[in-house]
């Protein structure tokens, strides 16, 4: 599923409305990646779990986490290696991403770093980023030293929030990863690591015949770098195959068509909710989804909660008029006046926790 719209068109409200409906009428697990801290009140109202990841928090998620069901073939390390390559691309890669030699070195070290854990999969043997860093330092190639140096700030420096074993229990049915306080330098990395944590949850739930819903706000941030985008597209496909239901929320339609590979996300989305669109994005969507000129009028200067729904080969206009006197409306709205209303009702906000 995709939720597309300009700022202020009601994307987050639409996502929260969908999350609320799923929470009430299904038994699916729901996980949210929240880059702007917008989902706190709703999640807490449903007794969900908010995990705040920041350089100063004490909640940790380990990017090296893996389980034996991580992939659907005999080699879970292949997919994990793709993830770590994506992570290293964000940390190390310049304009052209990682060099082939660097990819080879990383892949080699990934296979080495998990040897002890896969031989005896107990929690205390799960590697952390520092173990990968130490292995890189031991390699003979000059490129490995460059990789290790780039990782150093994430292991021993001021950005070491991801150099810990996971210390939060993710057993709640509704989980929100609040990464607002990671800052610009760590946010994309945080989104990628959360996505990997969700994949681990999907693999566990598959065995229990349970669906996993994943909502990714500011989804376009994962599509900027080539390796990261390729990994995200692959995970998107695997989510659907393994009983996961991903929802990307973004204002940047152009990023969804940045390459033929990324375009597969469109082709693998049965349901697209389009709110008000910028002029250039309207033309892209019209071509991609075969939307008529008349239908485009519903996403041209449209009001909040108005637009088009694309489902299968059907396109229908909609207007969502939600009763703004309800407490649920106050929980879902991010308008300042509604935040104030929540406070008057005694509902804790993100900064009150």
Which positions does each model-derived feature cover?
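Glycine-rich phosphate-binding loop of nucleotide-binding enzymes
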Residues: 1-55
């Amino acid at each position: 599923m995709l939720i597309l719209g300009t700022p202020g068109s009601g994307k987050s409200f639409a996502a929260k409305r969908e999350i609320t409906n799923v929470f009430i009428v299904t038994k699916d697990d729901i996980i949210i990646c929240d880059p702007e801290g917008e989902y706190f009140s709703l999640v807490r109202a449903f007794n969900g779990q908010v995990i705040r990841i920041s350089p100063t928090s004490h909640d940790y998620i380990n990017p090296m986490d893996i389980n034996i069901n991580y992939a659907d073939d005999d080699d879970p390390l292949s997919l994990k290696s793709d993830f770590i390559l994506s992570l290293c691309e964000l940390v190390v890669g310049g304009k052209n991403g990682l060099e082939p030699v660097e990819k080879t070195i990383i892949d080699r070290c990934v296979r080495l770093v998990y040897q002890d854990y896969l031989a005896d999969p107990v929690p205390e043997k799960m590697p952390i980023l520092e173990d990968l860093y130490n292995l890189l330092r031991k390699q003979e190639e000059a490129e490995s030293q460059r990789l290790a140096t780039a990782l150093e700030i994430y292991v021993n420096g001021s950005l070491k929030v991801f150099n810990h074993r996971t210390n939060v229990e993710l057993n709640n049915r509704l989980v929100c990863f609040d990464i607002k306080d990671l800052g610009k330098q760590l946010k994309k990395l945080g989104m990628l690591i959360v996505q990997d944590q969700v994949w681990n949850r999907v693999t566990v739930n598959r065995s229990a015949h349970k669906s996993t819903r994943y909502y990714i706000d500011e989804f376009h941030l994962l599509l900027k770098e080539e390796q990261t985008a390729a990994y995200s597209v692959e995970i998107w496909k695997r989510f659907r195959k393994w009983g996961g239901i991903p929802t990307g929320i973004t204002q940047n339609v152009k990023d969804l068509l940045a390459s033929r590979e990324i375009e597969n996300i469109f082709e693998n989305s049965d349901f697209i909710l389009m709110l008000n669109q910028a002029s250039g994005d309207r033309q892209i969507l019209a071509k991609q989804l075969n939307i008529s000129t008349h239908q485009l009028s519903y996403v041209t200067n449209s009001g909040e909660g108005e637009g088009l729904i694309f489902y299968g080969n059907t396109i229908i206009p909609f207007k969502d008029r939600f009763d703004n006197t309800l407490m649920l409306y106050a929980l879902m709205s991010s308008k300042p006046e509604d935040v104030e209303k929540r406070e008057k009702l005694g509902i804790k906000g993100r900064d009150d926790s």
